[in-house]
UniProtKB/Swiss-Prot annotation:
Family annotation (PANTHER family): PYRIDOXAL 5'-PHOSPHATE SYNTHASE SUBUNIT SNO (PTHR31559), PYRIDOXAL 5'-PHOSPHATE SYNTHASE SUBUNIT SNO1-RELATED (PTHR31559:SF0)
Protein name: Pyridoxal 5'-phosphate synthase subunit PdxT
Signal sequence, renumbered to the chain: none
Catalytic residues of the enzyme: 78, 174, 176
Length: 190
């Protein structure tokens, strides 16, 4: 199995390092011809408007949507989660492309600016009893989930920060910045 990591902007190298530590082959995806070579795709954190525009510029938006329709597992972290969302709480920036694959409403920068970034331990039942140490950097949150979406983790105040819909996975935080590979293992099992 080869896992693609969208490598247009953002924390793609950290995802590759985590996957390679699990013995999984990776490929940086920048072009449609690279997308056809992978069985799964991670869309990393970064800046969602920039990544969305680059998806269009490099002719990847529709091919990713098509691969998702064919059942390819896709995981979006932070900005990647925003790109997966069907809806954005405060609306999309004018002209902002998005994949719109997952029946969630995401809210950008839900916790504030860069200075408000934080780390916390989350209870994630699908990962077992041990808490998952999550890193939130200018993180979004999920305001609303559709009927087919399973909430995987919430903060103590109830804000949803991880969800799954079929073979789509979304995390508001950055599992690739921790030494804990459990979310990567979960994704590999989708």
């Amino acid at each position: 199995m080869t896992v693609g990591v969208l490598a247009l902007q953002g924390a793609f190298i950290e995802h590759e390092t985590m996957l390679q530590g699990l013995g999984v082959a990776t490929l940086q995806v920048r072009l449609p011809e690279q997308l056809v070579q992978v069985e799964r795709l991670i869309i990393p954190g970064g800046e969602s408007t920039t990544i969305g525009k680059l998806l269009v510029r490099f002719d990847l938006l529709e091919p990713i949507q098509q691969r998702a329709a064919e059942g390819m597992p896709i995981w979006g972290t932070c900005a990647g989660m925003i790109l997966l969302a069907k809806e954005i709480a405060e609306g999309r920036v004018e002209g902002q492309p998005a994949l719109g694959l997952m029946d969630i409403t995401a809210r950008r920068n839900a916790f504030g600016r860069q200075v408000d970034s934080f780390e916390t331990n989350l209870q994630v039942p699908v990962l077992g009893e041990a808490p998952f140490h999550a890193v939130f950097i200018r993180a979004p949150q999920i305001d609303k989930v559709g009927e087919a979406v399973e909430t995987l983790a919430s903060l103590d105040d109830g804000r949803i920060v991880a969800a799954r819909q079929g073979k789509l996975l979304a995390t508001a935080f950055h599992p690739e910045l921790t030494g804990d590979a459990r979310f990567h293992e979960l994704f590999l099992g989708l």
